[in-house]
Amino acid sequence: MQYSIEVNNQVEIFDLNKVAKQASGAVLLRVKNTVVLATVAREDVQVEEDFLPLTVQYIEKAYAAGKIPGGYVKRETKPGDFETLTARIIDRSLRPLFPKGYAYPTQIVVMVLSADPEVDLQVVSLNAASVALYLSDIPVNRPVCGVRVGYIDDKFVINPSNSELKQSAIDLYVAGTKDELLMIEMRSLPQQTTQLIPMVAIEPMIDPSLSDSMAQKQVMNEFSEDKMVEAIDFAGKAILRASSAYEEAFKEHKKEDAALELKPEIENENIAIYIDKFYKAEVKNAINQMAKSERASELGKIAKQISSDEVAQKEGWDEAVITNVLGKYKKKIVREQIINEGIRADGRGLEEVRPISIETNVLPNAHGSCLFTRGQTQALVVATLGTDSDAQMYDILTEKAPLVEKFMFNYNFPGFSVGEASPLKAPGRRELGHGNLAKRALAPSIDLASPYTIRVVSEILESNGSSSMASVCGGSLALRAAGVNTQKLVAGVAMGLIFEGEKHAVLTDIMGLEDHDGDMDFKVAGTSDGITALQMDIKLGGISLEVLKEALYQAKRGREHILALMTQADKNIEINEDVLPKLELFNVDPSKIVDIIGQAGKTIKEIIEKFEVSIDLDREKGEVKIAGGAKKNVDAAKDYIISITSKENSRSFGKKPFKHDKDRVKPTFNIGDEFTGSVKSVVDFGVFIELKDGVDGLLHISKIKSPLNVGDQVKVCVSEQKGNKISLSLVE
């Protein structure tokens, strides 16, 4: 059975009951030439633990783009970062739909079987998974829809194509039902202006006399709070259209809900009364302790104490029931205090940010580092600079060639950060998600024309909420500490929202306790001029645009407070020049690149070994990039390369010469000819002297009696000439 639904700028063709009929729910969705299979399967036996055992897997098949997997194992193996992040988006969007007490192991699998380069796989995959879940026998009574919003030529565009998205100022992904928004992710997309500026204005380390290369200026494209509300409202209307269309089309095909037993909420009014009467002070004290840590061990101690009381033993109260009721009582106390008194568990006001301390370049041998502490959340963020060869290469299903990533952000969350003795493992979905959020926040501030490959690592040393936003703040300062000239400082703050009846409270800089007991997790990062990244997960029903706007502006005030402290810390940064890599970027005639490489790479290998540098060449632009640990080595390598490319006998292998070389009369020299020339460059093995018509000769170090500097006038004579390679001697 096939349904075609035209909605939100795309035609979606759903095939029902065609494939995977043994699954609880399955759907084949086609959009243009993209085909996605989404399946839902569940077990019949509940788990004993009190959580939703939902697993979401998103798999891209290489054959979907006519590819064979690379590497030794020619099949799909470990999921890539994009697959993991997409699975996380689907999970966060669908998890709120499951009824309370649902504890049956459930697996949602989305497989990309055919990939159109212009179709957004994340939008299509979520919509396919949503319909498959809605059609299944799991008691989910409303479909979710995902949409992407771009902002192109001052207009919002729903579900732009992949090529259109590259022209957009923002990338906004929103998921929800016809009644409520459930998940939001946003990033600003930096763009290039058409105004050309000298490369030296972008990267001061470049020698302006040698680099006539030009680069375009980058615009960060931060989004204002008002514009963000407008964009989310635009997305909400699109979600309403699609979700309503899904429900209307598929309601009659939904399977009858299976007779599943839902775990009842553990309630015991007598225990709650007993706690309120005899343990209220202990609970409040536990809340104060929990405000300092993400661990909940204090409540466990109280539960054990209550279960050992005579009343509890007489009434036969189970410790598990006591623990559950105690947790709800704690949540009630926390929320009531915030709503009624405007005071949080740690004594802060609603808009108050925890105390912040900042130290930069605390690691003497790292390129740039920052220890950023906010309350009981602490991040050690380290920036490392590299060359083009250090960039990350990765495959995208819809791209023919591997892509290169020159800015990387890694987030690590060890167990000791929350006082747990857990084994250190490979990064999971949470670590990848938090790292991706921090990367999105910082990326617009890093100029695309930067010659460096940059890796930032955030080590969470303490955590009590908002560790990803601490990573953003620390990361922005670590980049500055490494000498990276970012356009602006970027700060992040985690917001919370609590609803009680008609009242609500927006919280700035939430801690772990408020994240757990609140109704919304809302992370906002940006500069003083606007938002660069945003992530929101809503645990309750719909949120009004007025409340959303209030939260965004409150986040802006918190962000400005943090930026003021970061700006002061930025002024006090002492860059450790001794450990920073030295880099030179200059241009030569593209036809001379072959001379730098030499036969079978012999020349470039000799340069790399002799001067202990790394060299990256761009054959098309004639761009040469030299990096090394010592400035004198980099300068010497640069001078040596310039000497190679300035020779008239350099091999061009059929390349066209510069126009101004066409009619040049090549100078001739005789042994013994004397000249007074200027020292053009100084290298380890001698100096190059400018003779006439731009031709240089080498005065070897063995023939130099006293130190010479660039610009010195020296009288020399030609002692040897091999082709156009001229050796000189001093004239006494």
From Swiss-Prot:
GO terms for cellular component: cytosol. Transmembrane segments: none annotated. SUPFAM superfamilies: Eukaryotic type KH-domain (KH-domain type I), Nucleic acid-binding proteins, Ribonuclease PH domain 2-like, Ribosomal protein S5 domain 2-like. Its cofactor is Mg(2+). Mg(2+) binds at D515, D521. It catalyses: RNA(n+1) + phosphate = RNA(n) + a ribonucleoside 5'-diphosphate. The keyword Ligase does not apply. PROSITE patterns: KH_TYPE_1, S1. Residues 672-731 form the S1 motif domain. It is an enzyme of class 2 (transferase). InterPro entries: ExoRNase_PH_dom1, ExoRNase_PH_dom2, ExoRNase_PH_dom2_sf, KH_dom, KH_dom_type_1, KH_dom_type_1_sf, NA-bd_OB-fold, PNPase. Belongs to the polyribonucleotide nucleotidyltransferase family. HAMAP family: PNPase. This is Polyribonucleotide nucleotidyltransferase. The gene is pnp.
